[in-house]
C-alpha cells in the first residue's frame, strides 16, 4: 500500500517529513516529492504550493509518477462550524468548489461543468480517520463538508454568502476540491484532513499567521494516526 500525502505549505508537511524514515527526494517541475516510510506505510509526501492550479499540478504528477493507492490532503482551513475551535479538525464527508458558478447551464452552485457537484472521499479512509479520533486527546474532530476556492476568506459579507450557498460547510480552504477532482479523474481514492487555523472572519489574517504551525501539526498528527489505522487489505 502506497499513500500520497499533499500539503500546500511547509508547516503543513514539515512534521510528516520529519517523522519519515528511508526518505529519498525527487524534484519534478519545481515540486519536491519525498518518498519513504511513515507510520509503517509507504508514502510520498509533497508540498504543492497554494491554490487550486498548484494543487492540481502536484496531484497529477504524484499520481502519474508514483501511482499511489490513495491520496490524503492535509493542512489548515478556515472554520465555519460553531462547534469547532482553532486547532480542531474536519474530516471531509464531501468536498466542493465554492467559487465555481456555471448555474446558467443547469449545474449546481459550486459544480464545475461535466464534473460531479461534490467529490466523495473513500469510505475506508474516512473510517480510518474516525478510528484515529480517539487518540487525538483534547483535539476535537468531526466529519463535514469542506469547500475550496482560490481566495483566503476573511470578509464577513463573503462568509455570509458562502453559508447561504453551502449551509452545512464546516471548513474552507484553497486546494482540497482541486485534489479531489484530479483523484476523481484518475480513479484514485482520497480524503481531505484539515485543522482550523482561523474562523474565516476579520481576525483571520492574524489568526492564520499565529496558528498555522499548530494547525499543521494537528493535521499531520491526524494523518499519522490515520495511517496507523489503515489496513493494507482495505484498499478499494
Curated annotation (Swiss-Prot):
The keyword Ribonucleoprotein does not apply. Keywords: Amino-acid biosynthesis, Hydrolase, Methionine biosynthesis. It holds the Pfam family PNP_UDP_1. The active site is at residues 12, 198. GO terms for molecular function: adenosylhomocysteine nucleosidase activity; methylthioadenosine nucleosidase activity. Substrate binds at residues 78, 153, 174-175. Its EC number is 3.2.2.9. Disulfide bonds: none annotated. SUPFAM superfamilies: Purine and uridine phosphorylases. One of its GO terms (cellular component) is cytosol. It comes from the Bacteria. Belongs to the PNP/UDP phosphorylase family. MtnN subfamily. This is 5'-methylthioadenosine/S-adenosylhomocysteine nucleosidase. It comes from Shewanella sp. (strain ANA-3).
Amino acid at each position: 500500500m502506497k499513500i500520497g500525502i499533499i500539503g500546500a505549505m511547509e508547516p503543513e508537511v514539515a512534521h510528516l517529513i520529519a517523522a519519515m524514515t528511508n526518505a529519498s527526494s525527487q524534484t519534478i517541475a519545481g515540486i519536491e516529492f519525498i518518498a519513504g516510510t511513515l507510520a509503517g506505510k509507504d508514502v510520498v509526501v509533497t508540498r504543492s504550493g497554494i491554490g487550486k492550479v498548484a494543487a492540481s499540478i502536484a496531484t497529477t504528477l504524484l499520481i502519474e509518477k508514483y501511482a499511489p493507492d490513495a491520496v490524503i490532503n492535509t493542512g489548515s482551513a478556515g472554520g465555519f462550524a460553531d462547534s469547532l475551535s482553532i486547532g480542531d479538525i474536519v474530516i471531509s464527508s464531501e468536498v466542493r468548489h465554492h467559487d465555481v458558478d456555471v448555474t446558467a447551464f443547469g449545474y449546481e452552485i459550486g459544480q464545475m461543468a461535466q464534473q460531479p457537484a461534490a467529490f466523495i472521499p473513500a469510505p475506508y479512509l474516512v473510517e480510518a480517520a474516525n478510528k484515529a479520533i480517539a487518540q487525538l486527546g483534547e483535539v476535537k474532530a468531526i466529519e463535514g463538508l469542506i469547500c475550496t476556492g482560490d481566495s483566503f476568506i476573511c470578509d464577513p459579507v463573503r462568509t455570509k454568502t458562502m453559508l447561504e450557498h453551502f449551509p452545512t460547510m464546516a471548513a474552507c480552504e484553497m486546494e482540497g476540491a482541486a485534489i479531489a477532482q484530479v483523484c476523481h479523474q484518475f480513479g484514485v481514492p482520497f480524503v481531505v484532513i484539515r485543522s482550523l487555523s482561523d474562523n474565516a472572519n476579520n481576525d483571520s489574517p492574524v489568526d492564520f499567521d499565529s496558528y498555522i504551525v499548530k494547525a499543521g501539526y494537528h493535521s499531520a498528527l491526524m494523518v499519522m494516526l490515520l495511517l496507523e489505522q489503515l489496513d493494507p487489505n482495505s484498499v478499494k
